[in-house]
Curated annotation (Swiss-Prot):
Pfam families: tRNA-synt_1b. ATP binds at residue 242. GO terms for molecular function: ATP binding; RNA binding; tyrosine-tRNA ligase activity. NCBIfam families: tyrS. It is an enzyme of class 6 (ligase). It comes from Beijerinckia indica subsp. indica (strain ATCC 9039 / DSM 1715 / NCIMB 8712). Homodimer. GO terms for biological process: tyrosyl-tRNA aminoacylation. InterPro entries: aa-tRNA-synth_Ic, Rossmann-like_a/b/a_fold, S4_RNA-bd_sf, Tyr-tRNA-ligase, Tyr-tRNA-ligase_bac-type, Tyr-tRNA-ligase_bac_1. A motif ('KMSKS' region) lies at residues 239-243. One of its GO terms (cellular component) is cytosol. This is Tyrosine--tRNA ligase.
């Protein structure tokens, strides 16, 4: 399959048209495998945080498209590899997590996937596995003899994840050095257990994935394939999935639905078309129409992107509520009940009212009262859409009971509420 010949399989055609495809070890062979049906592919997710964030969405969407085009997705939880730590893209060693932390993170991450793929026992139903099941059962000497002998240290030292650390005189532990061996073994084990033929991942995983293909060949498995997606950045070059306030989590408990909706609504104009292709299932002709909008009209495309992307993660009803909240807040100027809220107890509020500096700090809109003072001097803080000019102002308990909307700039809002009873 050359660049001039479109893929014959629905799976690779969709990945190509929508911008998911970066590298593939054997495009023609994989295309034929996908076209014939029954393609089984996996992506691994280490348990380094309590949930996944937007930076993982490209990989999750690839699993979703695989299932929608007749393939079987495997979600591999890295219960074992998380204990080792992936050095890819890292300047220093990852923090070593306890087994309890890894297990807690794994449970949080698991919840994300049922929103994107269907799990079950059917031919195309998704499967979830955990590499701790086989990695923790390995005997060290046996692993060295049976598996380790197939790895070339010369080649391992040439991998970007290793080479960059060494060139910068940054420490790379023996533990991390073994990560690619574990990931390669995962691929072979998943092929042996489930007939998995393809490993997908971000472009930073190319070396590790290809190492798995090579290990499989040396250990006598059938043909295996690698496919990676491009490193996702915004049009201005910022890393996807992070904002000034932190990660854009896919878990409502870690990031309110409204904030998630706002993240997509606030994307750059140049990113709208690309994000619609990657993070929604809108038809390409509709995306082309939205992408062509100019000036103020592009904001309508951003609202559609925000609602569709939010519906994918949090459901259609929650996405529509977030869109309605934004409309009321920004276009109608009313206090929307579904804004992110901070609930205060009556005993937290002095008799004379809550100081404005403390209120913004409690709301999490500023990190300190001194930052609140600076924002007031710059005209950046508002109470119920009115600019705050007096740093000694207070919000009465009655105002909080009615719902006091605090705003930082034009796009960050929190509603202060009084606890019931």
């Amino acid at each position: 399959m050359s660049k001039d010949i479109p893929p014959a399989s629905d799976f690779l055609a969709i990945l190509t048209e929508r911008g998911f495809l970066h590298q593939c070890s054997d495009p023609a062979g994989l295309d034929e495998k996908a076209k014939s049906g029954g393609l089984i592919a996996y992506i691994g997710f280490d348990c380094t945080a309590p949930s996944l964030h937007v930076g993982s969405l490209v990989q999750i969407m690839m699993l979703r498209w695989l299932q929608k085009t007749g393939g079987k997705p495997i979600v591999l939880m890295g219960g074992g590899t998380t204990r080792v730590g992936d050095p890819s893209g890292k300047d220093e060693s990852r923090k070593i997590l306890t087994l309890e932390e890894i297990e807690a993170n794994k449970q949080g991450i698991k919840q994300v996937f049922s929103k994107f793929v269907h799990f079950g026992e059917g031919k195309t139903d998704a499967l979830m596995a955990d590499n701790a099941e086989w990695l923790t059962a390995l005997h060290y000497i046996d692993f060295l003899r049976d598996v380790g002998r197939h790895f070339s240290v010369n080649r391992m030292l040439s991998m970007d994840s290793v080479k960059l650390r060494l060139e910068r005189d940054q420490e790379l532990s023996f533990l991390e050095f073994n990560y690619m061996c574990c990931q390669a073994y995962d691929f072979v084990e998943l092929h042996k257990r489930y007939g998995c033929q393809l490993q997908m991942g971000g472009s930073d995983q190319w070396g590790n994935i290809v190492t798995g293909i090579d290990l499989g060949r040396r250990m006598g498995t059938a043909q295996l394939y690698a496919l990676t997606s491009p490193l996702l950045t915004t049009a201005s070059g910022a890393k996807m999935g992070k904002t000034a306030k932190g990660a854009v989590w896919l878990d409502e408990a870690m990031l309110p639905v409204f904030d998630y909706w706002q993240f997509w609504r606030n994307c750059e104009d140049r990113d709208v078309g690309r994000f619609l292709k990657l993070f929604t299932e809108l038809p390409l002709d509709e995306i082309a129409r939205l992408e062509a909008l100019q000036d103020a009209e592009i904001n309508e495309a951003k609202k559609i992107l925000a609602t569709e992307a939010t519906a994918m993660v949090h459901g259609r009803e929650a996405a529509e509520r977030a869109a309605d909240t934004a409309r009321q807040t920004f276009e109608e100027g009313v206090v929307a009940a579904s804004l992110p809220s901070v609930i205060l107890q009556t005993n937290e509020i002095p008799a004379e009212g809550l100081g404005i500096l403390a209120a913004f700090a409690k709301a999490g809109l500023v990190n300190s009262t001194s930052e609140a003072r600076r924002q007031i001097k710059g005209g950046g803080l508002r109470l119920n859409d009115q600019p705050i000019t007096d740093e000694k102002a207070v919000i009465t308990i009655e105002a909080i009971e009615a719902g006091a909307k605090l705003s930082l700039g034009r796009k960050k809002h929190v509603l202060l509420r009084l606890a019931d009873g």
